[in-house]
Amino acid sequence: MDFELEPSLEELIKQDTLKWIFVGGKGGVGKTTTSSSIAVQLALQHPNDEFLLISTDPAHNLSDAFCQKFGKDARKVEGLSNLSCMEIDPEAAMSDLQQQAQQYNNDPNDPLKSIMNDMTGSIPGIDEALSFMEVLKHIKNQKVNESDDSKDKISYRTIIFDTAPTGHTLRFLQLPSTLQKLLGKFQQLSGKLGPMMSMLGGGGQGQQDMFAKLNEVQKNVEEVNEQFTNPDLTTFVCVCISEFLSLYETERMIQELMSYQMDVNSIVVNQLLFADDDENPCKRCVARWKMQKKYLDQMAELYEDYHLVKMPLLGSEIRGVENLKKFSKFLIKPYDPKVDRGIITDLKEQ
């Protein structure tokens, strides 16, 4: 490389075209704090635009991060009027799906209904699928004008995803491509499936409604799949800590993301001690910082063409809008332990 990329997310925050930002990594590395910080900085840097932060992790933490209760519908963040949050609940989505299946046909002997109930209860990764469908539904509702020909007319400038731990996230991101292929095959079979269902006693208006709904879902999935693989519209921010297992997981995730043709060029490293600049560092801190530096050096070598953002370990939890504002500024302006050390003890207890 002839140049070194800035160790910050300033370029990402200021980019005009991004519609989707995914934030993911191993469990316990600070994904929610990082995604919340990115969302806060986007809202601060672009006060005339609306932003949405969505948690797709079944163990939701957004409410804790902002000290404010969120649910399955987008709700404004108190103290930051152009940022909204929502937490997708796969169990509630599962219940809604089964109720919708019952509305199509009340006949308990209908084989199609039996198949649908079995599928919704036993498909591996159904949580991710339902989360994805909830996202699709929300995006459709956000279209400014359904008659507008432009695909990208969504009222939120950017949607940020606080994702589940790595395995769930990778399955979630694989869904657009998988569903696109599956629905395409299902559509090919639908012509033959219709008469067969009629012979078995199913079919009728309910079946037609289901096929119409599948057509609509397929169009939405195709649109999202196009956007997820467009680096101008979508990017993924990896979050890790400076330890072997986290570094290994990050590399595995980056390789998977590249296989999905998804843009990834930013890594946030959390919980760094910067013990070299402590006046009276404890032996444990010095030993741990030595280990962290070893893996930081490996990351710098391995990811020289990535934005590698180094975030400090603070003395208290990062909760509430004001604390997130203070912490998130280091995503834009790299943390300097000689100048910024006050932040470690400056946060207000929530």
UniProtKB/Swiss-Prot annotation:
InterPro entries: Anion-transp_ATPase-like_dom (IPR025723), ATPase_ArsA/GET3 (IPR016300), ATPase_ArsA/GET3_euk (IPR027542), P-loop_NTPase (IPR027417). Gene3D superfamilies: P-loop containing nucleotide triphosphate hydrolases (3.40.50.300). Keywords: ATP-binding, Cytoplasm, Endoplasmic reticulum, Golgi apparatus, Hydrolase, Metal-binding, Nucleotide-binding, Transport, Zinc. Pfam families: ArsA_ATPase (PF02374). GO terms for biological process: tail-anchored membrane protein insertion into ER membrane. It is found in: Cytoplasm; Endoplasmic reticulum; Golgi apparatus. Its EC number is 3.6.-.-. It comes from the Eukaryota. GO terms for cellular component: GET complex; Golgi apparatus. Zn(2+) binds at C282, C285. It is an enzyme of class 3 (hydrolase). The active site is at D57. GO terms for molecular function: ATP binding; ATP hydrolysis activity; metal ion binding. The keyword Zinc applies. ATP binds at K26, G27, G28, V29, G30, K31, T32, T33, E243, N270. The keyword Metal-binding applies. NCBIfam families: GET3_arsA_TRC40. ATPase required for the post-translational delivery of tail-anchored (TA) proteins to the endoplasmic reticulum. Recognizes and selectively binds the transmembrane domain of TA proteins in the cytosol. This complex then targets to the endoplasmic reticulum by membrane-bound receptors GET1 and GET2, where the tail-anchored protein is released for insertion. This process is regulated by ATP binding and hydrolysis. ATP binding drives the homodimer towards the closed dimer state, facilitating recognition of newly synthesized TA membrane proteins. ATP hydrolysis is required for insertion. Homodimer. Component of the Golgi to ER traffic (GET) complex, which is composed of GET1, GET2 and GET3. Within the complex, GET1 and GET2 form a heterotetramer which is stabilized by phosphatidylinositol binding and which binds to the GET3 homodimer. Interacts with the chloride channel protein GEF1. Belongs to the arsA ATPase family. This is ATPase GET3. It comes from Candida albicans (strain SC5314 / ATCC MYA-2876).
